[in-house]
Swiss-Prot record:
The lineage of its organism: Eukaryota, Amoebozoa, Evosea, Eumycetozoa, Dictyostelia. The EVH1/WH1 domain is necessary for cortical localization. It comes from Dictyostelium discoideum (Social amoeba). Keywords: Cytoplasm, Nucleus. It comes from the Eukaryota. It is found in: Cytoplasm, Cell cortex; Nucleus. Gene3D superfamilies: Pleckstrin-homology domain (PH domain)/Phosphotyrosine-binding domain (PTB) (2.30.29.30). PANTHER family: ATP SYNTHASE GAMMA-RELATED (PTHR23318), SERINE_THREONINE-PROTEIN PHOSPHATASE 4 REGULATORY SUBUNIT 3 (PTHR23318:SF0). A motif (Nuclear localization signal) lies at residues 1003-1022. Residues 626-1046 are annotated as: Disordered. One of its GO terms (biological process) is regulation of double-strand break repair. Belongs to the SMEK family. Residues 665-689, 743-752, 784-803, 996-1011 have a biased composition (Acidic residues). This is Suppressor of Mek1.
Length: 1046
């Protein structure tokens, strides 16, 4: 190719981004001898000097800009260059030459370039430059072919020998070093195989000794090392020579990579050498594991060898190297190898030589065991637990060697072995754990029972003390067991007292107790003991906590804390962290134990808040440990049977659980309780039992409660008595509560009304008393007592007072019941059930009589209504509201007592009477008044009273009884009866109007009422024992006909 001479300017881009003018000259595209390739060369037009000389690249790095500019970046130096042509024709000619070279890559230049020159001293530089150049992959392949064609390696080694013998070719030896280095960096497997072959390896190592960057005094003599120091020793006959060759080659590659060329190897070449080593190892292991005879022979030779012999040491080292090679294989290949060697007797062979006197032999044995465990621990566990006799002895041998061996390397290896064996949580390892806790752990912790006074093997290094090393690792192993083997280790520690033995080593002075001392404990032994104790506390196990408390195991920890209380060191911080953990986890037993035992010490520590928080937590625990009222009420052992226990009043509420518990007392205890309280009825201490919401009967509430309860007991025992009512309202004490008597029929909704009592708002407006069945009892009592009315007037007067008191007591008790709706509901259901049972017993007998009586009542009521004057009806409708509670009325004095009795009877009425005002409200809601039919007691009628509202059944009963008495007496009594009836109705209106205006009553009237109530109560209780059991009769709980109608 003829040179094209064109006039150009050469530019180079500097670091600042500016183009520097390098000169003007003529450019040619020719073969450059110095480059041994086609290139661009620019010579100065002034002195013909070379301004630019660059090799043409086959890569697409050139760009033509406009018509006279070619720009590119050098691949090696990363310099940005540009040629600016004088005319566009010259630029086009050079551009075409570049494209032709890239497209064809042919011509005299290529064929000459890729032919290596003959090997000689004069051509060493040319060969070196050719190998150093960055060539395309095609050119590299051609050079590699030329290397093998010309036998370049052998020729260079021959030249190296001649130059080295002459002793005058220092520069040429450096050039040969660079040539071999570049051959290796070619990263071609075929070239590496030639260089590392047995024929050329030692001579190549000699050429690589002359590194120009290393001085002659520091030069490494590789040949001397390989020939004299590295000697291949065959301890056992190998099955084939190819295996031996692979072993040699692997060693040499490893030496070349790690010793000869570690500085000059790039990443690609380094990786290629590792790959070559890896595949050689696979080949070696595969050949050995496939030859079972070879392995059996190997194990047999090891067992036959004498103790502490060189032969045994070499054999075990060979086995160790073989296992190390297998560790680097893939999982499948590694698993296959270890399975084969274990099945052929690996562990049995190691057990036979584990106690060898040679340290290297013991280290190699433990290293082989550890290599097996790192692959799969189940291999050794299965071997130890196999039914073959004697296999479990291998575990005992390892533990004994850990305790007694004098080499710290052996101890370290065995500790790792035991840890690896214990790292199991699967069900398959249960057999091994059983073996370990039966035969291994007692031996493992046996050094804790002895006194150790060992000295460090290295002066000034406490960690070199072998005895302390053993103790520390025992602590670490026990800590691991505590964390992962909760069940077995827990009982072992408690039964064998391991904690107490370990905590002896917290004593830095060396004084120990209990048959052994801790010696002069090293600092790390004390920390190990604290860490062991911390692991026990960390489990938060009751057995551990009780063991700590019973054995007083905190004492050694506290002693360490006292000795370091003013020091800011690791021991102090570790113990404070222990206290902080106990506080945060709220381990109550330990908190109480610590504070009660060491409170003075904790209070003296002011530089941390942990101990103060611990004391505060203790106070909270102690406060909560006392039985609260609610808890004590639910406790059936003590508080429920304590007659002096009282409900706690807080926020105007009584403890409901307490009251419910008192009601659950059996009948005999309840009678004894109230009989005792009867004797101390005036006790002022029981005033606190009164709910704050009942403010008008504070002085007599406890007595009323007792009377009410006794009446309840009497009513339960007497079939003729009526059971107590569960839901009442305050009787004239400023309460707007209204009683409604509602008899059960098909349209009644008493169940829903009773459920609504649970709400306080509904209770205040709709307090419902569902005692329909009691009507039969009242009617029966009325019929039985009609004929004896005149004979029982005196008793009736007393009964009036007693009934009045009973009513007020019921009301006071109901004030308490309002604060205990849930408990009252429970008793309501039980009382209703008892009432219904009693009524069902008499239902068949009384049904017909009651139906007749009801019919007669209807006829009599109709006659009374016909005789009723209309002017009286108007007068009653316009009657102003007056207070009848204190016996005041506009009627005559003769009717005054009757009004009081009638008012009391209406208030009592066995808590069944409905006031007219509340009845009117009830009718407004119902809008239609319908006749109610009692399914069990027969039909009843509802008539209009003189005020135009429905008259309650009790009131009709009063009319009926009155008319019956008048029929027995003279006709004049009929008129008096009617007048009394009218007066009673007037008083009823007044009484109900008084209930409406009761909130406006004066304080003096309330005090007067309280005094009057007190007199009635005392009168009742004084006459209670003197009367002929009148309190047990029906008069105490149900009004007689004379009470209902005077």
């Amino acid at each position: 190719m003829e040179p094209l001479r064109k006039r150009v300017k050469v530019y180079q881009l500097d670091n600042s981004g500016k183009w520097d003018d390098k000169g003007t000259g003529h450019v040619s595209c020719i073969y450059v001898d110095a480059l041994c390739a086609m290139g661009l060369i620019v010579r100065s037009e002034s002195d013909n000097s070379v301004i630019l000389q660059t090799r043409l690249s086959a890569e697409d790095i050139y760009q033509k800009q406009q018509d006279s500019l070619i720009v590119w970046t050098e691949p090696d130096s990363q310099l940005d260059l540009a040629l600016s042509f004088q005319d566009s024709l010259g630029c086009q000619d050079i551009w075409e030459n570049i494209l032709q070279y890239q497209n064809q890559r042919t011509g005299s230049c290529d064929s000459v370039d890729l032919d290596l020159p003959p090997v000689s001293i004069n051509n060493l530089q040319t060969i070196n430059e050719l190998l150093e150049a960055s060539l395309p992959m095609l050119d590299k392949d051609k050079i590699i072919n030329s290397i093998f064609k010309e036998d370049l390696v052998r020729s260079l080694l021959d030249l190296f020998d001649e130059i080295e013998k002459s002793g005058e070719g220092g520069v040429h030896l450096f050039q040969i070093f660079n040539i071999f280095k570049n051959l290796i960096l070619f990263n071609d497997t075929s070239i590496l195989e030639v260089i590392l072959s047995e024929d050329y390896l030692v001579r190549v190592m000699g050429a690589l000794e002359y590194d120009p960057e290393i001085s002659e005094n520091n030069r490494i003599k590789h040949r001397e090392f390989l020939n004299q120091q590295v000697v291949f020793k065959q301890v056992i006959k190998f099955p084939s020579k190819s295996l031996i060759g692979t072993i040699h080659q692997t060693f040499r590659i490893q030496y070349l990579k790690d010793v000869v060329l570690p500085r000059v190897l790039d990443d690609v070449t380094f990786s290629s050498l590792n790959s070559l080593i890896y595949f050689n190892n696979i080949d070696i292991v595969s050949q050995i594991q496939n030859d079972s005879d070879f392995l059996e022979n190997l194990f047999s030779e090891i067992q036959k060898s004498e103790k502490n012999s060189e032969e045994r040491k070499d054999l075990i080292l060979f086995l160790q190297d073989l296992c190390n090679l297998a560790k680097g294989l893939q999982i499948q290949s590694k698993s296959t190898f270890f399975t084969v060697v274990v099945s052929l007797g690996l562990f049995k062979t190691l057990s036979a030589i584990l106690d060898d006197e040679n340290v290297q032999t013991r280290v190699s044995c433990t290293e082989i065991v550890l290599s097996t465990l790192l692959h799969d621990p189940e291999i050794l566990r299965s071997y130890l637990c196999s039914p073959t006799s004697g296999n479990s002895k291998f575990l005992v041998q390892l533990i004994n060697l850990f305790i007694t061996d004098k080499d710290i390397g052996v101890k370290n290896q065995i500790v790792e072995i035991i840890k690896t064996l214990l790292e199991a949580d699967s069900y398959d390892s249960s057999d091994f754990f059983r073996l370990f806790y039966d035969k291994g752990i007692d031996l493992l912790v046996s050094p804790l029972n002895e006194v150790y006074k060992g000295e460090p093997t290295i002066p000034g290094d406490p960690s070199s003390n072998l005895d302390s090393f053993v103790l520390y690792n025992i602590m670490e192993l026990v800590i691991y067991c505590i964390k992962h083997h909760c069940y077995r280790i827990k009982h072992f520690i408690v039964e064998e007292g391991i904690a107490k033995k370990i905590l002896r080593y917290t004593n830095p002075t060396g004084s120990g107790g209990g048959g052994g001392g801790g010696g002069n404990s090293e600092r790390y032994l004390i920390l190990g003991s604290i860490r062991f104790f911390r692991s026990m506390v960390n489990m938060k196990d009751d057995l551990y906590n009780q063991h700590i408390i019973q054995e007083n195991l905190f004492e050694p920890i506290i002693e360490v804390f006292k000795s370091n209380i003013s020091r800011y060191n690791l021991l102090n911080s570790a113990i404070i962290e222990l206290f902080q953990y106990i506080y945060k986890e709220n381990i109550r037993d330990l908190i109480v134990y610590l504070v009660e035992r060491y409170r003075e010490l904790f209070e003296s520590v002011t530089y941390t808040d942990v101990l103060k928080q611990l004391i505060l937590k203790y106070e909270q625990i102690k406060d909560s440990s006392f039985e609260s009222p609610e808890t004590s009420c639910n406790n059936n052992d003590s508080s429920s049977n304590d007659i002096d226990s009282k409900p706690i009043i807080g926020n105007n509420k009584i403890n409901h659980n307490y009251q419910r518990t008192q009601r659950e007392i059996d009948e005999e205890e309840e009678e004894a309780y109230f009989n005792r309280d009867d004797d101390s009825e005036d006790s002022d201490d029981e005033d606190e039992l009164i709910p704050i919401s009942i403010n008008n009967n504070n002085n007599n509430n406890n007595n009323n409660k007792q009377i009410c309860t006794n009446n309840e007991n009497n009513m339960e025992k007497n079939d003729d008595n009526i059971e107590k009512d569960n839901e009442n309202t305050n009787n004239g004490n400023g309460s707007s509560h209204i009683k409604i008597v509602d008899y059960e029929d098909e349209d009644d909704e008493d169940d829903e009304i009773n459920k609504s009592v649970e709400s306080d708002d509904i209770v205040e407006k709709h307090e419902i008393i569902d005692k329909n069945e009691k009507k039969d009892e009242i009617m029966k009592e009325n019929n039985d007592s009609d004929n004896d009315d005149n004979d029982n007037n005196d008793n009736d007067n007393d009964n009036d007072n007693n009934s009045d008191i009973e009513n007020k007591n019921h009301l006071n008790n109901n004030g308490n019941n309002e604060n205990n709706e849930n408990n009252d509901d429970v008793q309501d259901k039980s009382n209703n059930k008892n009432n219904s049972d009693k009524i069902n017993e008499d239902e068949k007998i009384e049904k017909q009589d009651e139906m007749k009586e009801n019919l007669e009542m209807e006829e009599i009521d109709e006659k009374v209504k016909e005789k009723q004057p209309k002017d009286i009806k108007k007068e009653n409708q316009s009657q102003p509201d007056e207070t009848v509670f204190n016996g005041k009325s506009n009627n005559s004095n003769n009717n005054n007592n009757n009004n009081n009795n009638n008012s009391n009877n209406q208030e009592i009425g066995d808590n069944r009477k409905t006031t007219p005002k509340r009845k009117l409200d009830y009718e407004k809601n119902e809008s239609v008044v319908s006749k109610k039919i009692d399914k069990s007691n027969g039909p009843t009628s509802i008539d209009k009273d003189i005020n135009g509202c429905d008259e309650s059944p009790n009131k009709k009963l009063n009319n009926n009884n009155s008319n019956n008495n008048n029929n027995n007496n003279n006709n004049n009594n009929n008129n008096n009866n009617n007048n009394n009836n009218n007066n009673n109705n007037n008083n009823n209106n007044n009484n109900n109007n008084q209930n409406d205006e009761n909130e406006l009553s004066s304080a003096s009237e309330e005090e007067e009422e309280q005094l009057e109530n007190g007199k009635h109560i005392k009168k009742f209780k004084r006459g209670k024992k003197d009367s002929n059991n009148s309190s047990n009769n029906s008069n105490n709980s149900s009004p007689t006909p004379s009470e209902l109608h005077v």
